[in-house]
Amino acid sequence: MVPEAWRSGLVSTGRVVGVLLLLGALNKASTVIHYEIPEEREKGFAVGNVVANLGLDLGSLSARRFRVVSGASRRFFEVNRETGEMFVNDRLDREELCGTLPSCTVTLELVVENPLELFSVEVVIQDINDNNPAFPTQEMKLEISEAVAPGTRFPLESAHDPDVGSNSLQTYELSRNEYFALRVQTREDSTKYAELVLERALDREREPSLQLVLTALDGGTPALSASLPIHIKVLDANDNAPVFNQSLYRARVLEDAPSGTRVVQVLATDLDEGPNGEIIYSFGSHNRAGVRQLFALDLVTGMLTIKGRLDFEDTKLHEIYIQAKDKGANPEGAHCKVLVEVVDVNDNAPEITVTSVYSPVPEDAPLGTVIALLSVTDLDAGENGLVTCEVPPGLPFSLTSSLKNYFTLKTSADLDRETVPEYNLSITARDAGTPSLSALTIVRVQVSDINDNPPQSSQSSYDVYIEENNLPGAPILNLSVWDPDAPQNARLSFFLLEQGAETGLVGRYFTINRDNGIVSSLVPLDYEDRREFELTAHISDGGTPVLATNISVNIFVTDRNDNAPQVLYPRPGGSSVEMLPRGTSAGHLVSRVVGWDADAGHNAWLSYSLLGSPNQSLFAIGLHTGQISTARPVQDTDSPRQTLTVLIKDNGEPSLSTTATLTVSVTEDSPEARAEFPSGSAPREQKKNLTFYLLLSLILVSVGFVVTVFGVIIFKVYKWKQSRDLYRAPVSSLYRTPGPSLHADAVRGGLMSPHLYHQVYLTTDSRRSDPLLKKPGAASPLASRQNTLRSCDPVFYRQVLGAESAPPGQQAPPNTDWRFSQAQRPGTSGSQNGDDTGTWPNNQFDTEMLQAMILASASEAADGSSTLGGGAGTMGLSARYGPQFTLQHVPDYRQNVYIPGSNATLTNAAGKRDGKAPAGGNGNKKKSGKKEKK
């Protein structure tokens, strides 16, 4: 039954020899599994459950990318990923795969990832008896002389069986006869061949020919056979046969030896003479197939030469049988054996196969990350087959040997996509032969990006200068920012943030394009309103996590000449009359026109000129000071009423201008002359009303202050009683500074901004208790001009200066209730003539001092009861403002009024230029400070 089962090929899968050897079980990366399977199994034949044998999780095969890797062009095996069974995928013919090799093994690799593991599976293909022995010829003819002595051996044709092992050729059988016997011999490669042995002398006359049958049998079950008819012709005697000088010859030859290379020369001799002694050499009948294609034999000389191309990897040793025959009528032959050893040369370059590539690789991949798996083979032997692999130096990769002929490509240093986004690795495999042969393959490794770079800019801050009255929506800045990461991580978003506690600047004044970083203004900017903006550009990328960069953006508004000069004195719309006695000499200071400009720099520099008067030769005006003086003595013929129109121009481009009108009355300095101008009584009545309201306000504020103080004291006492161990009640002290001045502080709520602080100074020699305004808490009178009188509430301005008064920029009616004496004329010394050709101030500080001085003069000029000749140290101001009036009391017109032409600087008693009050005013200053503290 067993032979019949093998013959029908119905061997069940349960009878497969499943020899499983787990070699190196402690090292999973080097596990080798062995299976044995007969050849010629049908497609789908189950070999074994390789997944279970490897200890792998069947459910994770797809996730780990389980696959079969085979270097052959045909894939003989596959693995069912659902069951884990390995099955036959293609026809297995052992003779086709391995020829006559004693062992036939098909090797394949199984690869799984996450983590990357490699398993080797060796399937031994078992031979079955599927091939009959075969003779190279259909029949064999022998000519044997009757003189041949018994015991002579005659080689017979050898049969060839492709099967191996027990299924190969095992023996020969000879048909029954009375002359010959059969002797079966074994070669060095364990193959069998037969020899015909003469046991009884032949008698040609009795039997001139013989018919024998040679049968070749293999060892299979059932045994297969082949028959060869042998025709023997009995010849007449040639009693001497050739003899070789040695029965075995050995030779060594390089596998790359060219055709025609001599291998060995055999030599045989025959004692006969004549044709019976002439020897002819030929290949014996026992040679294996292919010998005649590789070697050539000279029939006369017996020289064995190379005919074809030898291959050490195919056959390492060739066994050649040579026979020698004479030329006699009945030639007898002699035989010898030649063993040709093929010497290996390094004629095969290594072969590289990339079995798995992990790409792209994240640039933050840790050291030792597996990138690719490579298999390297070399068909040469010995040192010629020893292969090493290498990558070019200087790259962040290395090769390590994991299994025999397998190399793992790993990372050996940190990767940076921004530096090198892609590598084309030239992997070289080199053997140890001489000369060394090599192979080259390219492995492409892409580096994937991670968000490891924040947005970058060429500069950390930007200073932008933009002219006021700009066009809304026009770009003012394009931020130059980039991100070296990949496009997704480098997608930038721009935002504007505000610096400090001030809010609302971004949505009110500026905006930024979120995609391209272009900053634009939303509204026209006003230099006089705000000169500087401090913003922060926040740039974030599109990566995860988000990286960001902040850039400071400082926007400076530059001035344009968009404000015409304004007249401070004489007040616009008012009736300003200056008295000029007849007989006044030339150079007498008549009055001073005071103007200011809301612009800055050159745009605020003012110049004065007379447009017209009844007598052009009588008056002259300082170009830069605005001082009007007599150009010649006043004569009796001069008109008693002179109307002067002063043109005030700034220094901008284009220049803007305004005019001021001043009336000069030439009088005899008598009461009748003064009565000609009755309009001066109105300001006095206004001043009476103003004084009344100021006193009433002062009383109300004082009462409120006292009530507040008492309330605070009562509250403190109450708290002290509750926790007398922890708190001490403060004692409030009121100080009254002695002196001629009555000083009261008042905070005017509701009419002005809360940050403005106003002080009212009442002096004992003031007839109408004229008020002055100051900016509170300023260390210098030259602070920002954004809080000057031009921003005051007009109602409050009229309440302080009188019902007919107007804030700067509005002209008030003239005040005729006073007259200037020579000592009371406006001027830096009270009596000196103005310098019409004076130079511009030397520096900004001098300019600011002069502006403050002229504004103070303008305030006195607006008051008909004041004088302008205050003496030294007061810059021409009234004596009543001497101790108290410092630069602290002047509204901040430091950049709005520029009247050059004088090099004089304002100094205090100590000669300093910081605008501090002199020693005589310390009492009032301390009193004011205490009230501010409260």
Swiss-Prot record:
Residues 32-135, 136-244, 245-352, 353-457, 458-567, 572-685 form the Cadherin domain. Residues 804-843, 904-934 are annotated as: Disordered. GO terms for molecular function: calcium ion binding. Residues 924-934 have a biased composition (Basic residues). Residues 1-31 form the signal peptide. InterPro entries: Cadherin-like_dom, Cadherin-like_sf, Cadherin_C, Cadherin_CBD, Cadherin_CS, Cadherin_N, Protocadherin/Cadherin-CA. One of its GO terms (biological process) is homophilic cell adhesion via plasma membrane adhesion molecules. The keyword Glycoprotein applies. It is a single-pass type I membrane protein. Keywords: Calcium, Cell adhesion, Cell membrane, Glycoprotein, Membrane, Repeat, Signal, Transmembrane, Transmembrane helix. Residues 715-934 are cytoplasmic. Its main location: membrane. The keyword Transmembrane helix applies. GO terms for cellular component: membrane; plasma membrane. Glycans are attached at N245, N424, N478, N550, N615, N689. Residues 32-693 are extracellular. The chain crosses the membrane at residues 694-714. Residues 812-843 have a biased composition (Polar residues). It is found in: Cell membrane. Potential calcium-dependent cell-adhesion protein. May be involved in the establishment and maintenance of specific neuronal connections in the brain. This is Protocadherin gamma-C3. It comes from Homo sapiens. The gene is PCDHGC3.
